[in-house]
Amino acid sequence: MELVLVFLCSLLAPMVLASAAEKEKEMDPFHYDYQTLRIGGLVFAVVLFSVGILLILSRRCKCSFNQKPRAPGDEEAQVENLITANATEPQKAEN
């Protein structure tokens, strides 16, 4: 009787060890599917790139505050006006 019990237990031992190894594989948090992650990242990048190009081409993205449109050389003219305005002001004497 004891011999049969030992024999049955010896048959069950590899099954228990195999199931423990499978559980360890399933619970491994550092096993990643890099191919799926890579494809998902590329799809996400293409979608964001396409949305950005569409926004640029549609010109619907406007500033939140009201600003009158400027001429292309307007920024340079403002800088020149500031320089000439500072040059023409009389120097104040400090006491």
From Swiss-Prot:
Coiled-coil blocks: none
Gene Ontology, cellular component aspect: glutamatergic synapse; plasma membrane; postsynaptic membrane; presynaptic membrane
Gene Ontology molecular function terms on file: sodium channel regulator activity
Keywords for the protein's UniProt record, in alphabetical order: Cell membrane, Ion transport, Membrane, Potassium, Potassium transport, Signal, Sodium, Sodium transport, Sodium/potassium transport, Transmembrane, Transmembrane helix, Transport
PROSITE patterns the UniProt entry points to: FXYD
Signal peptide as annotated in the record: 1-18
Residue spans crossing the bilayer: 36-57
UniProt membrane topology term: Single-pass type I membrane protein
Coarse class of the protein's main subcellular location: membrane
Alphabetical list of PANTHER family matching this protein: FXYD DOMAIN-CONTAINING ION TRANSPORT REGULATOR 6-RELATED, SODIUM/POTASSIUM-TRANSPORTING ATPASE SUBUNIT GAMMA
Name of the featured protein: FXYD domain-containing ion transport regulator 6
